[in-house]
């Protein structure tokens, strides 16, 4: 059956066109106003944050700030009149001075960085990350992230343990010794597949020898069967034996 024709009411079509135009205009106006309000809010918030920063640090590059953030970055309440800022300064919550004072010798021993005689507080924070070498990775079975020199090989420290991989479950998987300098080679006659991993040739035991032997046996059996058929045809039809046939019951 042909598809039914959609009946359109002229009055409904005209009303829909009118509403569509008005709704599109309202949406465009809403987008413009929303963008203006967002820009005004962002500008006001930026001005408020910048007003709390000292003028000498406002043009500081972000990388320099992240590398060594200054202690007097924000305007204190007592410095508001001296700096001449009109905005209200936001005082940063910091612990009291006696709480921040630490022993210079203890700080130097902890951070391994000499501290000056006049420095009453430790403003340098050193984050020391433990270095994981091959021995630690082998003892704890922690996989090392792949890199240019560690990818594709076992990172065990001992030479005699480089031919195995220990899984987190404790299973030991033997691996062939990889020789990156060894070139590729073609498979031999008795091999089915030969491929290379990291330049070390690995060969899957093929079935070419057994398959060839089976094919030769099948060819011989076919030839012997054909020869026997030819000999039987040349001998003529078979004659039943009538002598001493005996009696049938």
UniProtKB/Swiss-Prot annotation:
Subcellular location: Nucleus; Chromosome, Centromere; Cytoplasm, Cytoskeleton, Spindle
Gene of this entry: csc-1
Biased composition annotated in UniProt, kind: Polar residues: 109-126
Keywords: Cell cycle, Cell division, Centromere, Chromosome, Coiled coil, Cytoplasm, Cytoskeleton, Mitosis, Nucleus
Compositional bias (Acidic residues): 73-85
Quaternary structure, from the entry: Component of the CPC complex which consists of icp-1; csc-1; bir-1 and air-2. Within the complex interacts with Aurora B/air-2, bir-1 and icp-1.
Keyword hit for Cytoplasm: yes
Species of origin: Caenorhabditis elegans
Compositional bias per record (Low complexity), positions renumbered to this chain: 224-236
Family (UniProt): Belongs to the borealin family. Highly divergent.
Broad class of where this protein is predominantly found: nucleus
Residue numbers spanned by region Disordered: 70-89, 94-183, 208-249
Name of the protein: Chromosome segregation and cytokinesis defective protein 1
Organism domain of life: Eukaryota
Keyword Oxidoreductase: no
Function: Component of the chromosomal passenger complex (CPC), a complex that acts as a key regulator of chromosome segregation and cytokinesis during mitosis. The CPC complex has essential functions at the centromere in ensuring correct chromosome alignment and segregation. In the complex, it may be required to direct the Aurora B/air-2 to centromeric DNA.
Stretch forming the signal peptide: none
Chain coiled-coil ranges: 12-48
GO biological process, one term: mitotic metaphase chromosome alignment
A GO CC annotation given for this chain: chromosome, centromeric region
